[in-house]
Amino acid sequence: MSEETSAQSEEWETHAGWWQEFFTDGADPEYEEQILPLADVHLAGFGRVLDVGCGEGQLARRVAALGAEVVGVDGSWAQIDAARRRGGGPTYLRGSATALPVASASCDAVMACLVLEHVEPFEPAIDEIVRVLARDGCFVLFLNHPLLQAPGSGWVDDHILGEQYWRLGPYLPDDASMEEVAPGVRLPFMHRPLGRYINVMAERGLLVEHMDEPPPSPGFVARAPEYGEAVAIPRLMVLRTRKVE
């Protein structure tokens, strides 16, 4: 691992328990109502699947249940240990997104769920994904929508104007920051405009063949009624790409 990637992994090592408590085993409606069902749609029918940044393995287990042979890779021992305890079929390896411990051209599909927005630089990770994919293989990228990640962006409930709206910060420049996502939990986030992801992938032979921008999940809106008017603003983006070179 590079020094910077290692430092990013240390943050996830520290906060692995927080992630497991609040985002797995049915705790998070956005995973239950959107991410896991979209994984069913985009990853069904593949034989060998790699989950990059697998965490404690909930997506890997889901895809394994579809009949795939799944390998999950994560930089956090705490996440890998939890994934192995929870079982469900996949094989788990500790490793970096920028140095995947997987043979070249050995995967029919690769997925990365809410991972690349925490990796800087991310181009080496894309290089590795291209390396391990077989020709005509599929890469499915789940992202926090770039509109949400622009610095200074946020939901505004304007009591003076009587309006609710999304304030968009500087969208075009790349930006790296440490964000407090819960009390005492600070994690690295990298904002990049959508074009950066698409162009970096295209330059390496990964071409977008499908894109999803679902509205916020009903469970999320039910938990946060103050976001009621945000049902037309996506929180998640999914890009399915195909390796053509």
Indicate residue ranges for each PLM-predicted region:
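Short alpha-helix
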Residues: 175, 188-211
